[in-house]
């Protein structure tokens, strides 16, 4: 809520101008209602604001931006909120030292503005569901959910996939690598980012 209020204040917009409120999260407070609906009430957004959560893990913000852009094209209002929020301490396994050092709690929000004269935002999205890991098939691990990650596989996936996605999005935007002043990456791991930088 605080991140959303700060973003709206920085953008100089009031709640009545918001037509879309999206919350990318894997740690929502409730199964239902969605965190986005809770925010709609707390922020006093109009009742016809499109509100829902997105479960896309690390790629949630990118999915949120892409979805907000598409929804705003059909909205009577020109602003949307993308509010990323995670409370990963709820699901982190602190005995897994290779994983627990990567995660914490936090929230960030962005105001998205729709304009008919803006060029569409080139986006590359996708999924690779083959990498899910069932740790102990069919076993109920108890009341506390635990986040599990295969670090080496994640590293390989990131350093192979990110440069390819960069090439695709640059191609869709009609740009070359040299045309871009800054790239903003998901900050999961410094080694991954250094490897990508050298590769590009």
Language model features: what each stretch is:
Residues 1-19, 139-181, 188-200:
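Conserved active-site "lid/cap" helical segment
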Residues 2, 34-37, 94, 195:
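Generic recognition of short, well-ordered alpha-helical segments
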Residues 24, 55, 79-86, 112, ...:
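Short beta-strand segments
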Residues 26-79, 198-200:
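Conserved catalytic cysteine-centered active-site region
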Residues 71-106:
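Flexible, glycine-rich active-site loops centered on histidine and acidic residues
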Residues 84, 129-133, 190:
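Acyl-CoA/ACP chain-elongation machinery
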Residues 94-160, 164-167:
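Condensing-enzyme catalytic core mediating Claisen C-C bond formation in acyl metabolism
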């Amino acid at each position: 809520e605080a991140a959303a209020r700060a973003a709206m204040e920085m953008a100089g917009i009031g709640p009545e101008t918001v037509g879309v409120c999206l919350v990318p999260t894997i740690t929502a407070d409730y199964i239902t209602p969605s965190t986005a609906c809770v925010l709609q009430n707390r922020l006093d957004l109009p009742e016809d604001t499109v509100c829902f959560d997105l479960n896309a893990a690390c790629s949630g913000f990118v999915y949120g931006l892409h979805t907000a852009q598409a929804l705003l094209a059909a909205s009577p209002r020109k602003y949307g909120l993308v509010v990323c929020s995670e409370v990963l301490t709820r699901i982190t396994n602190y005995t897994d030292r290779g994983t627990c050092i990567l995660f914490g709690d936090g929230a960030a929000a962005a105001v998205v503005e729709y304009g008919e004269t803006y060029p569409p935002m080139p986006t590359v999205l996708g999924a690779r569901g083959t990498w899910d890991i069932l740790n102990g098939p069919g076993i109920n691990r108890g009341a506390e959910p635990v986040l599990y990650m295969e670090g080496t596989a994640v590293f390989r996936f990131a350093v192979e996939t990110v440069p390819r996605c960069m090439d695709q999005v640059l191609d869709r935007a009609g740009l070359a690598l040299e045309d871009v002043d800054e790239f903003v990456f998901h900050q999961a791991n410094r080694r991954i980012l250094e490897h990508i930088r050298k590769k590009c």
